[in-house]
């Protein structure tokens, strides 16, 4: 049996309202658990439209057919009107998720983090994390013990800003296996569980067809030499591609693949994990920089 961490990112109002309940039903039918990471502040995702001026982002939007994939309400959210507070309006969905699955913080404001985390000072990074942690903890009535930054926008400064929150683990970068990140001061930080597999929007339309996507991902898992972690999005696999995602789970079971919460991938003794750093890098199919694992 191959254990694969299932990370579910929830970026928007619609993804929370519509995508998460669909995913909860699918996961219950397939007797599968995962880790949901919620954005809980304003939904300003439509403000990413300016990035269409960047060729790599424009190509990504075109090949993934973003308008039909996400819907115009997501693509325009927070542009002509203030973004709705996701946690405030969709609290019951988040609480229902917490009763069945591992949950953690994705972001307070997903758009702001993805756009500005690379230039914010440490104080602003800490304030954004704290705002999201406090909002999510108030919703679920329990401490938040894991997190995964929006857009994998993480580096040494971001990892250091997370230290005071005492998370059990973070999932802030792309890589091959769990590790202990070295902080800028030389000390070791909270365990990182990197995402190791490509997402739908990174490969569709370039090297993979819609019809061949499930086989592609399952083949990637069986060939993986590290600790596989797969990310889906409530806005995609929870809505337009929900039937395809359920077929993926069914076929995974036939191939001896078990999806699980990320926390279940941690060894009993985390001090035995390798040491490394999170550095800025690039990933095929994704516009802009993101955090990448660099093992010592």
From Swiss-Prot:
Q: InterPro entries in the record, alphabetically?
A: ArnD, Glyco_hydro/deAcase_b/a-brl, NODB_dom, Polysacc_deacetylase_ArnD
The record ties this protein, via Pfam families, to: Polysacc_deac_1
* Organism expressing this protein natively: Erwinia tasmaniensis (strain DSM 17950 / CFBP 7177 / CIP 109463 / NCPPB 4357 / Et1/99)
**What's in the keyword line of the UniProt record?**
Antibiotic resistance, Hydrolase, Lipid A biosynthesis, Lipid biosynthesis, Lipid metabolism, Lipopolysaccharide biosynthesis
A GO MF annotation of the entry reads:
hydrolase activity, acting on carbon-nitrogen (but not peptide) bonds, in linear amides
What is the role of this chain?
A: Catalyzes the deformylation of 4-deoxy-4-formamido-L-arabinose-phosphoundecaprenol to 4-amino-4-deoxy-L-arabinose-phosphoundecaprenol. The modified arabinose is attached to lipid A and is required for resistance to polymyxin and cationic antimicrobial peptides.
| Annotated family | Belongs to the polysaccharide deacetylase family. ArnD deformylase subfamily.
EC number assigned by the record: 3.5.1.n3
Q: What is this protein called?
A: Probable 4-deoxy-4-formamido-L-arabinose-phosphoundecaprenol deformylase ArnD
Q: Which reaction does it catalyse?
A: 4-deoxy-4-formamido-alpha-L-arabinopyranosyl di-trans,octa-cis-undecaprenyl phosphate + H2O = 4-amino-4-deoxy-alpha-L-arabinopyranosyl di-trans,octa-cis-undecaprenyl phosphate + formate
User: Is Lipid biosynthesis one of the keywords UniProt gives this record?
Assistant: yes
Gene of this entry? arnD
